[in-house]
């Protein structure tokens, strides 16, 4: 067993894939009891049955807090914000670490779940938290592989061990993005195409007209227009013209591809946390755009590596 580091400013993300051969409460109990013995709080944000079983093992210690297990948001930015809020509500703030247990929960979108688990290591890096994620082994065929890739630590019958398959969040996200390119919709005729765009007002009017006939609700359409507007304005300001905008609408999903001829940004972590939090100052556009869509990716516009195409996807 590897002893836990005492670094008070490191988010420690621990994965445990459950199986029928092990009693979860018996295995997890000692892991949490050591935290209580050190005077550090434990928060159980699990489904009722799991929270009850763990609380029974831990006893009536006043440092054990059971909170409702909210369904995980499908969109990674929303899921990350919810997790940060949960942690910040209970973080002691006096130098002690918080010990959080979440899951198991249903994962409707395996790709979004994988992105969220990877991004937790980036977004929460400075918080002094030990976060134990419980995962049901039957959720997907490769749950164990996903746990190893997204959790630097694993809880096993032998104790806490480094994950042999852990990958840096940026590397994992790059591979996930590349696997989905090009989007199959791009082989079809776009619903809307605007070449060499030079007037954002014309774009907004066209988007509002087309999206009014789409499968999106009025609020979702407004959010999508906001995201497209932010990315297009960024391309016009920082890229190299011409800027082209193409939109595909189907009953299931919508895709907008914004292309310019400047250099493409290669950091998939950009925009997953506001750089400064001041909406009156620039630099918040990508953060806003990510929160308004189901997926935002950037890649070179062609095989030569020239140009940049940002793809925004919303599931209807």
Task: Mark where each language-model region is.
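Amphipathic coiled-coil/heptad-repeat helices and related helical stalk/stem segments
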Residues: 28, 116, 228, 282-285
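Short, well-ordered alpha-helical segments
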Residues: 114, 201-205, 287
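Conserved beta-strand-loop-beta-strand hairpin that lines the nucleotide-binding pocket
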Residues: 182-184, 236-316
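Coiled-coil dimerization/phosphotransfer module
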Residues: 186-190, 222-233, 237-239, 273
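Short glycine/serine/threonine/alanine-rich loop segments
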Residues: 40, 129, 216, 241, ...
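Conserved short strand/loop->alpha-helix "switch" segment adjacent to the catalytic nucleotide/phosphoryl-transfer site
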Residues: 197, 201-232
